[in-house]
């Protein structure tokens, strides 16, 4: 299930983004400040390039690129 980012409380969204950008394997080998990485993801959400996917079975949220979401989920 896709969750519109604007429906989340600001603090919840920030924590979700911070969790995503600090996961192992998400850095690009550079020492980019956390604030910059959070801002990039927030902007991608606002542009619709990234989406929040909630999986009810596992009760997990994840950020995904829109291009990786099945087209039928976007209708």
From Swiss-Prot:
SUPFAM superfamilies in alphabetical order: YehU-like
Stated family: Belongs to the UPF0270 family.
Chain segments annotated as transmembrane: none
Gene3D superfamilies with a match to the protein in the record: YehU-like (1.10.10.610)
One Pfam family per UniProt: UPF0270
Source organism per UniProt: Azotobacter vinelandii (strain DJ / ATCC BAA-1303)
Protein name listed in UniProt: UPF0270 protein Avin_35000
């Amino acid at each position: 299930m896709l969750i519109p980012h604007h429906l989340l409380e600001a603090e919840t969204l920030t924590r979700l983004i911070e969790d995503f950008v600090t996961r192992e394997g998400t850095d690009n080998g550079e020492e980019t400040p956390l604030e910059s990485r959070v801002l990039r993801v927030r902007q991608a959400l606002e542009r619709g390039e990234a989406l929040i996917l909630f999986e009810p079975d596992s009760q997990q949220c994840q950020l995904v690129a829109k291009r990786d979401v099945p087209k039928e989920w976007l209708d």
